[in-house]
Amino acid sequence: MYKRLLSSVLIIMLLLSAWSPISVQASDGINDIRGHWAEEDLNKWMEKGILVGYQDGTIRPDNNITRAEFVTLINKVFGLYELSREQFADVEDSKWYSREILKARAAGYIAGYGSNVFKPDNYITRQEAVVIIAKVFELQSG
């Protein structure tokens, strides 16, 4: 169990540096991952639809990711689709991440901050990512 958790945490941490909100195809057209140390894995994740990129066709693998981007990644990796009926006060229905945050809330691995806010555009910290991953594994094994 410990090895599985550690492996999964390492994979998720690797993905942390490569997440963005708009879909792109894995192809030769993505210049910003050519020669990147994780190029092969990034292409595999794009082919599987787990990893997506920006509207300009870039992946930006060395950028930080937001809380909204991270929960979207978790939802895709773990196949979470059920939607909560209760949205956070700071998440507009028109935003690309609205449904993803509803999925995360329905799954029970996020609670947000006080005053019913999620802060979707804040960069996720490693501590927050580890807490989310631990909660998801708890839900999966429970």
Regions found by a protein language model. Give the residues of each.
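Feature responds to low-complexity, polar/acidic, surface-exposed segments characteristic
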Residues: 2-39, 47-100, 106-127, 133-142
